[in-house]
Design a protein with these regions (language model features):
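Beta->alpha turn/N-cap motifs
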Residues: 75-77, 87-101, 118, 192-193, ...
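A conserved helix-loop-strand patch within extracytoplasmic ligand-binding domains
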Residues: 114-163, 262
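Short helix-initiation/N-cap motifs at beta->coil->alpha
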Residues: 71-82, 169-198
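Short, polar/charged alpha-helical segment
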Residues: 40, 47-70
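Short, low-complexity disordered leader/linker segments with a strong preference
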Residues: 1-40, 283-288
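A bilobed periplasmic-binding-protein/Venus flytrap-type ligand-binding module shared by bacterial periplasmic
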Residues: 121-133, 233-246
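Ligand-binding clefts/hinges and TM-proximal coupling segments of bilobed small-molecule sensing domains
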Residues: 148-173, 253-288
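Ligand-binding "clamshell"
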Residues: 102-114, 129, 202, 207, ...
Length: 288
């Protein structure tokens, strides 16, 4: 399987812009149609275990249906949805439902979830502390800058007793302005989610989304707290709205519901074995 590293530099943007005005837009559409007809598909992922999930748990079933799968690596949460909406890729696996729906609404994108997958929750990590009880007055706490994961991080910190939020706040939209109790006057530092694991030496604790924690080699056994994923916070395979009921959408959903996928998730030594299971999985397989 080929992997592509998506790196957007200013020069590349300029080249792409020139290409658009030269008529590359129509060529791209033709290529997209050709890919679909030949069952060549591109699936976008972010740093973490979900590229491995495509390769180890999803690809085999798709290959049996005649697909050729190419994984496209992105470095942030923004590009994969934009690339999906524009037709540059055919699906992505890198975000939960709450983030997907908010990003799609905010950016007027027609992208939809087709199925949830087992997902690693966020963790609270530190290079300096062995317990949250060791937090001192004025310590810095790194949390993701994007609105959805920021709210998710605050909710986790509240669950762990570090802070308290307004009782009537929508937990999916909470901000630092909604913190009503912060006994240790903690200073919240917002960073791109991918940067937090690399910034633990400059803060007391950091809340790292599961995929980035795994990509950084962080050990969840040493985490100071681990998120129990609420409904809507398990990662999903997303496609364009037009593909939800298409052959591609149905085949991607079937791949996740397949025996091959189940075996890859549950086998001894699987990196996905401890991931939170979606509701459909529990209904189908129980606690396996």
């Amino acid at each position: 399987m080929k992997k592509i590293k998506k790196i957007l530099a200013l020069g590349l943007v300029s080249v792409l812009a020139i290409g658009i005005f030269a008529g590359c837009g129509s060529k791209s559409n033709d290529e997209g149609k050709s890919n679909k007809d030949s069952k060549d598909i591109k699936i976008g992922v972010c740093p973490g275990p979900y590229g491995d999930m495509v390769e180890k748990a999803i690809e085999l079933y798709l290959q049996s249906l005649g697909y050729k799968v190419e994984v496209v690596d992105f470095t942030d949460y923004v590009q994969p949805d934009q690339a999906l909406a524009s037709g540059e890729i055919d699906a992505n696996l890198m975000q939960h439902t709450v983030y997907l729906e908010k990003f799609a609404e905010d950016n007027n994108l027609d992208i939809k979830s087709i199925i949830e997958v087992p997902t690693a929750g966020a963790g609270v990590f530190s290079e300096k502390l062995k317990s949250l009880d060791e937090l001192k007055d004025g310590d810095k706490v790194a949390i993701p800058t994007d609105a959805v994961n920021l709210a998710r991080s605050l909710r986790l910190l509240e669950t762990l007793g570090v802070i308290k939020l307004k009782e009537d706040v929508d937990a999916t939209k909470a901000t630092t302005a909604d913190v009503t109790e912060n006994k240790k006057n903690l200073e919240f530092v917002t960073l791109d989610a991918a940067q937090i694991s690399r910034s633990l030496d400059s803060v007391a604790i950091g809340v790292v989304p599961g995929n980035y924690a795994i990509a950084a080699g962080l050990d969840f056994n040493s985490a100071l707290g681990v998120e129990k994923l609420a409904e809507g916070y398990k990662n999903v395979i997303a496609v364009r709205g037009e593909d939800v009921d298409s052959e591609l959408g149905k085949d991607l959903k079937a791949a996740v519901e397949s025996e091959e996928f189940f075996n890859a998730i549950t086998e001894d030594g699987s990196e996905f074995k401890s991931f939170d299971r979606p509701d459909w999985w529990t209904a189908k397989y129980g606690d396996k």
